[in-house]
Curated annotation (Swiss-Prot):
This is Phosphatidylserine decarboxylase proenzyme. Transmembrane segments: none annotated. Its main location: membrane. Its cofactor is pyruvate. Pfam families: PS_Dcarbxylase. It is a peripheral membrane protein. GO terms for molecular function: phosphatidylserine decarboxylase activity. The record marks G251, S252 as: Cleavage (non-hydrolytic). Binds 1 pyruvoyl group covalently per subunit. NCBIfam families: PS_decarb. Its EC number is 4.1.1.65.
Length: 287
């Protein structure tokens, strides 16, 4: 009954208004408030501050600075296995596996269209048909910067407007097409394993999504917008494996897509597996 009421509330709540209000609170610089709120959050979610570059909670100018905190050098060593594809973020594997008939598995009885996830462009989605996906959920206690699974050159970024349903196991099991309905930022790279998409999916009270090349991407105007980076007039944007790609201000999900016969997921990983940025997520499927 409780989960049913929760799902009903997800359709009724003003997602974007609540998220913008959360963003205002998270950017509040009133010292007593931001210190008290940050301390409460760190205790409530058992955030490990010993690995943070700045351990003193009161040193952060606002809650968002704490939430997107940098880590100490070496806190997330990169797997050195030749050809390793790295996990882009701390969190847990929500699902991973093949993209079958253009669909990505969400939870029992639910899936969503890879084409819709990527913004609806058939040409962008075509290289991923029959490929592989991995969905990584970032919990409140996690490190909230997203990094490159492989070295790549940015080809395209797409902002896709949408709802802001909460992202958790309950919504994954009850909200159809969840990740293809929420607001998201699609980043398309050319890599040694062919095209790679990294999709940063928003959620309720996710105040904004940033990338290292564009800065703040959300919240923009409520329309789909495509940014091309492969034009001759632009300086190429190349990011090395393990380099920061972007960050969430208040959390959610990163989805990585590869084309067919390019990667093989680590056998130790499955739905629910805890992961850390920099560990091996997959290996090349072929030499």
């Amino acid at each position: 009954m409780k989960s049913r009421l929760f799902i009903i509330s997800q359709y009724l709540l003003p997602h974007h208004l609540l998220s913008r209000l959360a963003g205002c609170i998270a950017e509040c610089r009133v010292r007593w408030f931001k210190n008290a709120f940050t301390a409460w959050f760190a205790k409530r979610y058992q955030v490990n501050m010993s690995e943070a570059l700045v351990e003193d909670l009161s040193a952060y100018e606002h809650f968002n600075a704490f939430f997107t905190r940098a880590l100490k050098p070496g806190a997330r060593p990169l797997d050195e296995t030749p050809g390793a594809i790295l996990c882009p973020a701390d969190g847990a594997v929500s699902q991973l596996g093949p993209i079958e008939h253009g669909r990505i598995f969400q939870a029992k009885g639910h899936g969503f269209s890879a084409q819709e996830l990527l913004g609806g462009d058939p040409a962008m989605a075509a290289p991923f048909m029959g490929g592989e996906f991995a969905t990584i959920y970032l919990s409140p206690k996690d490190y909230h910067r997203v990094h490159m699974p492989l070295a790549g050159t940015l080809r395209e970024m797409v902002y896709v407007p949408g709802r802001l349903f909460s992202v958790n196991q309950t919504t994954a099991e009850n909200v159809p097409e969840l990740f293809a309905r929420n607001e998201r930022v699609v980043c398309l790279f050319d890599t040694e394993r062919g095209p790679m998409a990294v999709v940063l999916v928003g959620a309720m009270i996710v105040a904004s999504i940033e990338t290292v090349w564009a800065g703040l991407v959300t919240p923009p105007k409520r329309e789909l917008k495509t940014f091309r980076y492969d034009e001759a007039s632009r300086t190429p944007i190349h990011l090395e494996k393990g380099a920061e790609l972007g960050r969430f201000k208040l959390g959610s999900t990163a989805i990585v897509l590869f084309g067919p016969e390019q990667v093989k997921w680590a056998e130790s990983l499955g739905a629910g597996s805890a992961v850390r940025m920099g560990q091996q997520l997959a290996a090349p499927a072929q030499a």
